[in-house]
Amino acid sequence: MKLHEYEAKNIFKKYGIPVPESFLVSKEDDLNSINVDKEVVLKAQVLVGGRGKAGGILFASNKEEFIKKAEELFNKEVKGEKVEKILVEEKLPIEKEYYVSIIIDRDAKKPLIIFSTEGGVDIEEVAEKNPEKIIKYHIDVRKPFLPYIARWIVKEAKLPSNEIGKVADVIYKLYKIFKELDATMVEINPLVITKDGNVYAADAVLHLDDDAAFRHNYEEFEEYKNKEKLPFAYVELDGDVAVIGNGAGLTLASMDIINNLGRKPACFLDIGGGADAETVKLALRKVLENKNVKGIFINILGGITRCDEVAKGIVEVLKEHPNVKFAVRMMGTNEEIGRKILEEHGIPYETSMEEAGRKLIEQL
């Protein structure tokens, strides 16, 4: 579960990580009643990356500018997401920008701290151009993470002595958040040093493990409250080809096919075993909510999932969205009946998933 920036920063504050002074503005608020008498940053609260480049961060120096910029944000979409809330922060006098994150390294099966003196830019870009500016440290979860480890990381990055204690303290507290809240990712980019020598988390990214919800009170978070109770596993991604399968392995293999054909999956959607026509309809409608989707790759190996039920669901949704590009690969239980249903409605199908993927990409 992804948290909005303002939610993540509220948690940072509770753990003693400095954040800029701020207030939250909602679409329903009366902007004229808000007094702004200094330079501020208006940050659209949307759960997408690259918000700044997409026009989701604006600046204002007085009330008139603030109202104008806030209205501009509320009336636009940032990478397909409507802006319902804006975090308004004091504009910091930034001297330096650093990067710090903690993620799960699935190869090493350990949490990984990543620190760089190159903040404010994509860490992938730094890794490609200046890999020597990235410090990595794998955490042994069987041992306590002590403050001296955070200091070692910062010293390895060759920070000035007057910054070591402050930055190390942020890293130490960041891992405390990561561990205590069952996070899968926590990131500050940039972690800034101001001209008066103070340190602030100028941005905040925090992803929590949905499977740990029973241990925490997630009800306070916006995405959890709004989360649909879907009868299938769904993860939205950055591509433009929706991938639907039955079974995690088959769905992942289908995503690999799309990647190998030069496109990126727009989602992972596993309808599971025994899905009926209604579940298939829900799945298709869900992926079509994503405005980036240009085509849908459906890969079904029927066991307890019946191909005729899948076909019925596809036909119903295609009536609602006749211009959507589909590719269907179906094999297994009631395969012949399912194929007949698709044929009657002019929907092509394949028995080879590679061929189905290739034909879909050719249409896009």
UniProtKB/Swiss-Prot annotation:
Cofactor: Mg(2+)
Protein name, per record: Succinate--CoA ligase [ADP-forming] subunit beta
Residues reported in the UniProt entry to bind Mg(2+): N189, D203
Pfam families found in the cross-reference section: ATP-grasp_2, Ligase_CoA
Chemical reaction(s) catalysed: succinate + ATP + CoA = succinyl-CoA + ADP + phosphate; GTP + succinate + CoA = succinyl-CoA + GDP + phosphate
Taxonomic placement: Archaea, Methanobacteriati, Methanobacteriota, Methanomada group, Methanococci
UniProt cross-references to InterPro entries, sorted A to Z: ATP-grasp, ATP-grasp_succ-CoA_synth-type, ATP_grasp_subdomain_1, Succ-CoA_synthase_bsu_CS, SUCC_ACL_C, Succ_CoA_ligase-like_bsu, Succinyl-CoA_synth-like
Organism: Methanocaldococcus jannaschii (strain ATCC 43067 / DSM 2661 / JAL-1 / JCM 10045 / NBRC 100440)
Keyword flag Endoplasmic reticulum: no
